[in-house]
Amino acid sequence: MSYQDLKECKIITAFITPFHEDGSINFDAIPALIEHLLDHHTDGILLAGTTAESPTLTHDEELELFAAVQKIVNGRVPLIAGVGTNDTRDSIEFVKEVAEFGGFAAGLAIVPYYNKPSQEGMYQHFKAIADASDLPIIIYNIPGRVVVELTPETMLRLADHPNIIGVKECTSLANMAYLIEHKPEEFLVYTGEDGDAFHAMNLGADGVISVASHTNGDEMHEMFTAIAESDMKKAAAIQRKFIPKVNALFSYPSPAPVKAVLNYMGFEAGPTRLPLVPAPEEDAKRIIKVVVDGDYEATKATVTGVLRPDY
């Protein structure tokens, strides 16, 4: 598996981790969730990312999750494994373990958080991870969560590494445009911002690594199809209706809102693990009205005037 496997993936879902009320992983809930995603235009699946609440998962739990999902997916779509932390040595050891585990198109490695490395420190961190195994690496650049930002210039240095095949970019559309304009041909650029997917695809991005595709994959697929067919009027009309849903899904720390919607839809997404908590009941009801029912009046009570948490 390689760049070519992922090149065809426009909608990659950053999969939640379903939990029981006691906080243990609900493995019995995973098959229905996976089939739902595949039935609604998910082209690839990211495991043990931020939406999976990876900071609260042990490596052993992540490996159990990997095995369970691989068995269910059975090669139908490419899988990406979250492999990075803010500890370079730990990241190297885990990426080696995941590479030996097998079955993944790539590993996703986040920009180191909390310890605030320099650009050179970040470059050396990702180079060391990419050098450690033959598992292709996608970099996750999300300064809203990690405080520091990998600049486009540093990203392009890393893009020359033969084992670094892409980026999940959550900075600005200006940075994304620069990367798309100057990147090597076989380097994937995904947006990690659902609300920016329309703009990113029009700039030439390869796709989106998405939370909203858990609940609104059909709309995203329809919008991307319209863009591919140069029907901008249709694509923009879908985007206008999609944005309030995205805002609702991120009106409370993620993945609490999407889990609330999935639970309402009949899937056993369960609660979040501390320190995240479920959305309050009244907020959850409003989120569901927007995301499921398209009740945009509920948007005003849910998201208007609320500073959306970074995800």
Swiss-Prot record:
Pyruvate binds at residues 51, 209. GO terms for biological process: diaminopimelate biosynthetic process; lysine biosynthetic process via diaminopimelate. It comes from the Bacteria. GO terms for molecular function: 4-hydroxy-tetrahydrodipicolinate synthase activity. The active site is at 140 (proton donor/acceptor), 168 (schiff-base intermediate with substrate). Homotetramer; dimer of dimers. Catalyzes the condensation of (S)-aspartate-beta-semialdehyde [(S)-ASA] and pyruvate to 4-hydroxy-tetrahydrodipicolinate (HTPA). This is 4-hydroxy-tetrahydrodipicolinate synthase. It comes from Streptococcus pneumoniae (strain CGSP14).
